Amino acid sequence: MAEASSLERQSPGAASCLPHSLCPGEPNLQTTAVVSMGSADHQFHLAEILSQNYGVREEHEGAAPGPEKPEEELEKDFVSQSSDMPLDELLALYGYETSDPISERESEGSDTAAHLPDMTLDKDQIAKDLLSGEEEEETQSSADDLTPSVTSHEASDLFPSQSGSCFLADADKEPGSSSSSDAEEDPLPANKCKKEIMVGPQFQADLSNLHSNRHGEKIYENEDQLLWDPNILPEREVEEFLYRAVKRRWHEMAGSQLPEGEAVKDSEQALYELVKCNFNAEEALRRLRFNVKVIRDGLCAWSEEERRNFEHGFRVHGKNFHLIQANKVRTRSVGECVEYYYLWKKSERYDYFSQQTRLGRRKYGPSGNTDADQDLEGSDPDGPGRPRSSPPLPLPAAAHGPGPEHDRLAQMHTEPLSMGSSMSRSLGEPGEALDVPPSSEPGPRLFPPLDEPSALPSSRRPPALAEPAFFPPATAAPEPGASPRLAVDLTLPEELPLVSSHEDTDGEPEETVGPPQVALSVAEFGLIGIGDVNPFLASHPACPASGLHSEPLSHCNVMTC
């Protein structure tokens, strides 16, 4: 291989091309084309070189019929085979019959010449090169000129599917051809490397004609409309006009006037009416009086009845403005209710409302519930959120008198009856007391109790059942020591009156413990027949009267289902 490389470097008449594939379908077969450019005797056409290469391909196919090897391995085998071949066979393989005398002389020292540069400073060598004649210079120049043309044009015509880069000479083996290809490339012009920044009046467009044409044009066809001019009337007169406008509106809606010291808010509608009236205050006020589309203040537009209904609806339904509008404030829309709610929250009326609601919740509500939202939304005692089985919240001490008839009928279905342990003892066997266990202790019960009433202190006697016309109400007041919960509308015969829960059947006081209670609903009296109770009560001895008015059981107003 060293001999071949020295031959390629020193022979002026040979130009080698890179190994390339002769057939696109068989990329594994590589060959090398050499074109002689020295003299007419040693010139070969490219067709003859291709015929030699086809012969080499057939030899390779016959010698290696086995499995195909990779391209790199075939290239290495070809290089190693060509390096081991003698010089004469290598020249015959590439189509050379005779060699130049200069190449034969320099091939003897190929081992040392491979590591030396092409140029030398030896005077003898320079003289021999000069004496060798002008033939060498002509051959070198012709090789440099014709190598790119042969490899680029003829090979590209024969193999159009192959890229032109496969037929160019290697830069390491042929510095002459690489330098010629570099010389063919034109350098970049100077204006492409350094661009000029176009700044200045000479690079600007002339828009004078465009601006002159647009001076008379309008942005839109509609004319501008004046909404307010602050320079015509002084500020004091404007404030007086606004105050009079608000005063007239208050007089029409609620019949009252604004205080003198209160600041007047701006009203865009009133000011716009003043502009339309050419700043005539009297005419603007006259138009505002009869204009139904004037934007009114939210708090001023609502009457006192509407405010009370809204507050009651807010206490019952919370922030469900649809229910408030449907049930409480039907004269307003849902949007107006929402607007009034946010205006109402900023007023002193809302502060007073929240204070009263929180006070009522602390006094009568369950302990530990102090949330402001729950106070405002669920603090109504008559609201739908209160369970039916829970007792009604007592009224203040000032409301001890009998309420209206519809309140008594409404509470009759929700408030359970309660009895003390003394009544259950009086209904027991003779000589022993019948103890009714509390609701938390297991055991048999005389009557299945309902939910036990709350243990909150009561300031008045709970309302009794509705008495019929023939039943006289109880007139005797209970003893001072008796619990108000023991007084019920169920009375017994005179022989067996009720005894206070704080005294035993023998008259001795009991321990100060919370008396057990039995809650009886009206429907449960239907389980007991009057004929079964009267003989049972007649067998018991009489007890001293306790001061309570009593009637026979047959006269009791019992509702059966």
UniProtKB/Swiss-Prot annotation:
Name the record gives this protein: Mesoderm induction early response protein 2
Q: List the disulfide bonds.
A: none
- Which residues are recorded with the post-translational modification Phosphoserine? S11
* Originating organism: Bos taurus
Subunit structure of this entry? Answer: Part of a complex containing at least CDYL, MIER1, MIER2, HDAC1 and HDAC2.
Residue ranges, compositional bias (Polar residues): 140-165
Domain SANT: from-to ranges: 297-349
Q: What's one GO-annotated cellular component?
A: nucleoplasm
Q: Which gene does this sequence derive from?
A: MIER2
Tell me the SMART domains matching this sequence: ELM2, SANT
Relate the protein's function as given in its record. Answer: Transcriptional repressor.
Recall the GO molecular function terms of this protein's record.
histone deacetylase binding; transcription corepressor activity
